[in-house]
Design a protein with these regions (language model features):
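Short, structured motif recognition centered on aromatic/hydrophobic residues
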Residues: 2-6, 18, 30, 50-54
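Intrinsic, low-complexity N-terminal interaction/targeting segments
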Residues: 29, 65-67, 105
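Short amphipathic alpha-helical segments
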Residues: 14-39
Length: 113
């Protein structure tokens, strides 16, 4: 299993607008296509203006297919038009689960459904 972590730095004072746009438009589109939302966060201490979210995938092939479908979704494209101007920078990490954590993550994801 893999977990992708995405970190977006948004313009100072724009975190609330970013999250509102995501909740109203982006989240519905993502949840239609991406299999497992692990978490969605914003920073309060340390480096500020960060939005962090994590998504789990069974394998890289699943990730590629899901992201391609999401990218083609008109609702996702409409969301990007609203939120891209708020983003200063973006990072992405693709992490492979440690062997002993795979089953635990699967149970956590199943419990959250």
């Amino acid at each position: 299993m893999y977990v992708e972590e995405r970190v977006y730095t948004v313009l100072p004072g724009k975190g609330g607008e970013y999250l509102k746009n995501y909740e109203e438009i982006g989240m519905k589109a993502q949840l239609r296509h991406l299999p497992h939302m692990v978490g969605y966060y914003f920073t309060e201490v340390g480096q500020l203006n960060l939005i962090v979210h994590q998504w789990a995938y069974d394998d890289l092939n699943q990730r590629d297919k899901c992201r391609a479908a999401m990218t083609a979704d008109p609702d996702w494209q409409a969301y990007l038009v609203k939120n891209r101007p708020l983003i200063v920078s973006q990072e992405s990490r693709l992490m492979k689960c440690a062997p002993f954590f795979v089953e635990r993550l699967k149970k956590m994801l199943a419990a959250g459904k």
